């Protein structure tokens, strides 16, 4: 089986998390989306800090910062324990070991993010890629089926993050 098939179950679970579903339906408040962006900022800053990406046009940190500046009204942001765990985990990986997490996080923005951009508060700069095909191609060029275990670990972290974000919003998402 290939990478896509080996990670399909975790991908499905992550997509079906209530917070993620609410984001796809355009139901997040500005505060909830800012909390999501805060987690994304920490993850992408760690991935990009001192690491070579398959393409420089993949870089998201500055765009996430622009989104946060646009939406920022609150001073206290939630940083989830699961986000700290994921950031700590990826901080201990070599550049080669980090590639499955680049695959997971950047392709999620490249594909799912294009549907999400019109549903979230603000401009959604995080989802803007200067050359989408080149960005996706740069990841596909280094992609390996052997990444499935590591991609599934990344999904486990993201599933926990989605659960944590949902738990900060209350049982009905408000």
Tell me what each language-model feature is.
Residues 1-174:
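Metal- and O2-centered redox machinery and metal/ROS homeostasis
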